[in-house]
Amino acid sequence: MTVFEGNFTEDISSLRFAIVIGRFNDLVTDKLLSGCQDCLKRHGVDVNPDGTQVDYIWVPGSFEVPMVARQVALSHRYDAVICLGAIIRGQTPHFDYVAAEAAKGIAAAAFQTGVPVVFGILTTDTLQQALERAGIKSNLGWNYGLSALEMASLMRQLRPRNEDKPLELLENNPQQALMEG
């Protein structure tokens, strides 16, 4: 029996990432981005905005993140997409709607494209809780970067041998695509 698991021993320099960041609550999202970049850099990824491994895409807020994440994943130029945002509860139900739709949209982007899309949207009751999760006590941005590295590695291992086949063939008739590989 074969065991598949994401690892960090492969050639990291060949991996490409897109990071989609919500600008709203940027006091928090800037810190999440820093933590994510720190993780990727320590694992050998060139996080320079002028480099070839990471593209940064800023959107107005967490509600817009899933649409852009899906579009980016559909391009199949990236091994993983990392979504960063912060939704902080207010005094209206708005929080519930935005948080639910962001979560559903990010999951749908991954399922519909086959590209790992990491859910890095903080949903907290207070700004203090968000800041604690973005750097005061720990920085979950680091965890989101690590998840992206692991999932990118795992998905590379799970690719069909004939990855040069058109995606439509793999999706519509995976059995035939594997036999032709």
From Swiss-Prot:
InterPro entries documented for this protein: LS, LS/RS, LS/RS_sf
Enzyme class: transferase
Gene Ontology CC, one term: riboflavin synthase complex
Catalytic reaction equation(s): (2S)-2-hydroxy-3-oxobutyl phosphate + 5-amino-6-(D-ribitylamino)uracil = 6,7-dimethyl-8-(1-D-ribityl)lumazine + phosphate + 2 H2O + H(+)
Coiled-coil stretches: none
The enzyme's E.C. designation: 2.5.1.78
Any GO molecular function: 6,7-dimethyl-8-ribityllumazine synthase activity
The name this protein goes by in its record: 6,7-dimethyl-8-ribityllumazine synthase
Active site (catalytic residues): 94 (proton donor)
Residues annotated as binding 5-amino-6-(D-ribitylamino)uracil: 24, 62-64, 86-88, 119
NCBIfam families noted in UniProt: lumazine-synth
Keyword annotations from UniProtKB, A to Z: Riboflavin biosynthesis, Transferase
CDD domains per UniProt: Lumazine_synthase-I
Biological process, per Gene Ontology: riboflavin biosynthetic process
Family: Belongs to the DMRL synthase family.
Lineage: Bacteria, Bacillati, Cyanobacteriota, Cyanophyceae, Oscillatoriophycideae
Functional description taken from the UniProt entry: Catalyzes the formation of 6,7-dimethyl-8-ribityllumazine by condensation of 5-amino-6-(D-ribitylamino)uracil with 3,4-dihydroxy-2-butanone 4-phosphate. This is the penultimate step in the biosynthesis of riboflavin.
Keyword Transferase: yes
Binding site for (2S)-2-hydroxy-3-oxobutyl phosphate: 91-92, 133
Amino-acid biosynthesis listed as a keyword: no
